[in-house]
């Protein structure tokens, strides 16, 4: 049977043109930050994205911070959340972004330590070289940073070498959720906004006859 081009494929393909615009940043404490341009609605995409980044960056999961990105017009359809498509369409782009970040850190380490790039290894957020020399990702973050967007080649980790992706992990937002610290849409406070209720007609194809701004009594 030939493969069918379905809604899942359509969503994935519509996100591809802007997938190269997502990026990962590293701070001086060695924490990787990523703002995912999709909606976390309980399906666990922030945890999944953090696991992918930690895997590709050779970084402990505890040192990855995934937040929800604000609306970015330039991302167009890369902000669509639906059809169980987020991880299908973002798995590789997130891996690529993490691999690019790792490559930049390795290049910075090679320059700072004065050793060949091929002589360096990464593990748990530390780059090590010959003779025991090493630098943490945090120490190299500023030197590895780039303010420009350019095409680069990247080699992804072989899936057979995965140690985190595919393993059971606690949700990164679980503690905040059960202790009342997690913010939901209902927690949003908009200055000057008034309570609103959606009114639906009791019949099919019903329509309102009028409206009033006068306060209701009773």
Go through each PLM region and give its residues.
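Cofactor-binding beta-sheet edge motifs in enzyme active sites
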Residues: 1-218
């Amino acid at each position: 049977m030939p493969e069918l081009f379905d809604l899942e494929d359509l969503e994935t393909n519509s996100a591809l043109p802007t997938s190269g615009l997502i990026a990962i940043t590293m701070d001086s404490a060695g924490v990787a930050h990523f703002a995912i341009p999709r909606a976390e609605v309980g399906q666990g995409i922030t945890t999944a994205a953090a696991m992918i980044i930690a895997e590709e960056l050779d970084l402990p999961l505890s040192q990855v911070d995934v937040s929800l990105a604000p609306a970015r017009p330039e991302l167009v359809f890369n902000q669509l959340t639906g059809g169980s498509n987020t991880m299908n369409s973002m798995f590789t782009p997130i891996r690529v972004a993490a691999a690019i970040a790792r490559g930049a850190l390795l290049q910075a380490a090679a320059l700072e330590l004065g050793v060949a790039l091929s002589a360096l290894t990464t593990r748990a957020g530390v780059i090590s070289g010959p003779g025991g020399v090493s630098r943490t990702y945090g120490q190299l973050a500023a030197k590895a940073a780039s303010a420009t967007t350019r095409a680069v080649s990247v080699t992804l980790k072989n899936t057979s070498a995965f140690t985190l992706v595919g393993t059971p992990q606690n949700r990164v937002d679980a503690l905040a959720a059960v202790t009342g610290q997690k913010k939901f849409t209902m927690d949003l406070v908009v200055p000057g906004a008034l309570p609103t209720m959606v009114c639906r007609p009791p019949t099919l194809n019903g329509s309102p006859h009028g409206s009033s701004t006068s306060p209701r009594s009773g």
